[in-house]
Design a protein with these regions (language model features):
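N-terminal auxiliary "cap/dimerization" subdomain that precedes the catalytic jelly-roll/cupin core
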Residues: 1-102, 106
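Generic preference for hydrophobic/aromatic residues in regular secondary structure cores
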Residues: 3-4, 40, 104-109, 113-117, ...
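A generic structural signal for short, non-catalytic loop/turn and secondary-structure boundary residues
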Residues: 17-18, 103, 108-110, 122, ...
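Hydrophobic alpha-helical segments and helix pairs
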Residues: 88-131
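Catalytic core of non-heme Fe(II) oxygenases with the double-stranded beta-helix
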Residues: 125-178
């Protein structure tokens, strides 16, 4: 039965999300994305106390910080992100058109924004097989991962197909990992 209240594109997006468990979409609110990028760039410059060019600072961040200093940087940045009254608004604006389409408009956003930074050859920051539900989060939440740079080759995140995810979940739940 056709739903008279949603467009065909919304229906396709919802069906893809239900089938695959995720969607990858192009950002529509570039202004909010740029605001977030500029926030990070300003923080990096202040934290490192260097007058760096904005042009490639995010793409070359791995050349600016040592792996041993990354966690302190990340924790300080998370603190600043969550102190800023405009950050959550801009973060939500980036994702809201798609969230509204896949889960509806009755949304709740977590109080704190989190952050993962992974540098080349940094084994300490890797997110192995990751699912928020394994750490006690609701299986009914939608998580937004927002890359701040163009992602390609090894500069990207791999998402398991649903069938493989189910196999790995069973493995983690088995006694082999307890």
């Amino acid at each position: 039965m056709a739903n008279l209240f949603i467009s065909e594109s919304e229906n396709q997006l919802s069906n893809k999300y239900l089938k695959d468990g995720y969607i990858i979409v192009d950002i529509q609110d570039i202004k909010s994305l740029d605001w977030i990028r500029q926030f990070y760039i300003r923080f990096i410059k202040n934290y490192l106390n260097q007058d760096l060019s904005n042009k490639d600072i995010l793409n070359n961040f791995h050349k600016l910080i040592k792996i041993k200093d990354l966690n302190n940087f990340r924790l300080k940045l998370i603190q600043e992100v969550n102190k800023n009254k405009n950050f959550r608004k801009n973060y939500f604006n980036v994702a809201s058109p798609f969230l509204n389409e896949i889960v509806g408009n009755e949304l709740v956003m977590q109080n704190r924004v989190n952050l993962s930074i992974q540098l080349p050859n940094d084994k300490s920051s890797l997110l192995d097989v990751h699912a928020d539900t394994w750490s006690g989060d609701s299986p009914f939440e939608s998580v937004v991962w927002l890359p701040l740079v163009d992602c390609f080759k090894t500069k990207s995140m791999f998402i398991l197909p649903a069938l493989k995810y189910k196999k790995i979940t069973k493995l983690f739940q088995s006694s082999k990992f307890k």
